């Protein structure tokens, strides 16, 4: 009985703090749905390549109108301490444009004439589908209150992201055949997965505008504090590749416009940008059998080449916020 009484009193105290005029705790609970767009590129760099920047191969994975559902909670403690926790999830098997594979096999190892120079030698295109997407975010900051009801919040953040794509069917074409369709492909050709762990610093600005509208923006930077691991599965070649790209650089930004229907209810539209310039790292290889089972014990580093990636993604969201 005493435990129940204590829990009841504790709950009443917390509720009183939340709903009091001078709040100790303020909560914004948000839910939104968005469409994710952009592209992610995968690279192979070979110092023997005659192509620009030593690019031997590039795979462009479309991110096209991929629906994402996200939830987040903003907590403000004692008016100044700021905490944010959020997560987002995608829907597997969602169509996502194409995957296009470009090769510049103009170095002596592949036997192509040197006069090809920077010209493309091989090309293929495939239907692209989302395999998986999940995103987790946590932020800690400190609110600074300025005149005109403007709030500035510097913060530190951690972001975990995992996404993957499957490419199916399509065809290949080659320069030596004057780019005629050479081979029709069927089934799963290549799958690609990226796992990203990032530590970021940023700043958030909130400002009221006309009527019941409010605008807030965030800018993040990860100064070579993003770790990217990628896995590339070539099913037809029965080969898997891993690229390890520590100390990568990235930028993110959000812009949010909200409208207060009631003091506890808001609707909002939000835009998001993410940019990761070309990042490079060690490339590892491992062979498989026709069923995808590994035929070798360990991953072997390919000392003659490097793997790499880059991305530019943007997102438009519509959402609802409940404030207490």
Feature-to-residue mapping (PLM):
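Cleavable N-terminal export/targeting peptides
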Residues: 1-26, 323-324
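Outer-envelope beta-barrel architecture signal
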Residues: 21-29, 67, 79-85, 148-154, ...
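Short, structured protein-protein interaction patches enriched in aromatics and acidic/basic residues
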Residues: 32-34
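Extracellular/periplasm-exposed beta-strand and loop segments of Gram-negative cell-envelope proteins
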Residues: 38-66, 91-135, 161-196, 222-254, ...
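Post-signal peptide N-terminal segment of secreted/secretory-pathway proteins
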Residues: 70-84, 88-93, 97, 101
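Residues on the lipid-exposed face of transmembrane beta-strands in outer-membrane beta-barrel proteins
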Residues: 71-75, 136-144, 156-160, 201-207, ...
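Acidic, polar low-complexity intrinsically disordered regions
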Residues: 89-93, 137, 141-142, 151-153
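Short helix-capping and hinge/turn segments at secondary-structure transitions, especially at repeat
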Residues: 204-210, 214, 224-226
């Amino acid at each position: 009985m005493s435990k129940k009484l204590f829990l009841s009193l504790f709950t009443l105290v917390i509720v009183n703090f939340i709903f009091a005029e001078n709040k100790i705790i303020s909560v914004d609970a948000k839910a939104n749905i968005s469409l994710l767009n952009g592209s992610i590129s995968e690279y192979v760099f070979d110092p023997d390549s005659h192509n620009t920047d030593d690019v031997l191969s590039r795979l462009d994975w479309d991110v096209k109108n991929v629906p994402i559902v996200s939830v987040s909670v903003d907590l403000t403690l004692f008016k100044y301490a700021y905490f944010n926790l959020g997560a987002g999830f995608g829907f597997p098997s969602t169509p996502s444009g194409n995957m296009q594979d470009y090769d510049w096999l103009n170095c002596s190892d592949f036997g192509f004439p040197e006069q090809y120079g920077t010209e493309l030698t091989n090309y293929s295109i495939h239907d692209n589908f989302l395999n998986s997407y999940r995103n987790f975010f946590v932020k800690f900051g400190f609110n600074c209150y300025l005149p005109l009801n403007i709030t500035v919040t510097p913060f530190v953040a951690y972001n975990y992201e995992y996404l993957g794509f499957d490419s199916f069917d399509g065809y290949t074409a080659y320069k030596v055949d004057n780019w005629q369709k050479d081979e029709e492909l069927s089934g799963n050709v290549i799958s690609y997965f990226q796992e990203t762990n990032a530590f970021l610093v940023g700043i958030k600005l909130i400002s009221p505008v006309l009527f019941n509208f409010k605008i807030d923006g965030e800018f993040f930077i990860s100064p070579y504090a993003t770790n990217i691991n990628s896995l590339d599965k070539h099913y037809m070649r029965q080969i898997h590749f891993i690229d390890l790209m520590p100390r990568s650089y990235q930028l993110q930004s959000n812009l949010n416009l909200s409208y207060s229907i009631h003091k506890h209810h808001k609707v909002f539209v939000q835009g998001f940008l993410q940019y990761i310039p070309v990042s490079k790292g060690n490339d590892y290889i491992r062979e498989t059998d026709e069923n995808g089972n590994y035929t070798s014990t360990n991953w072997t580093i390919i000392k003659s080449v490097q793997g790499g990636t880059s991305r530019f993604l943007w997102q438009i969201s519509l959402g609802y916020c409940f404030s207490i």
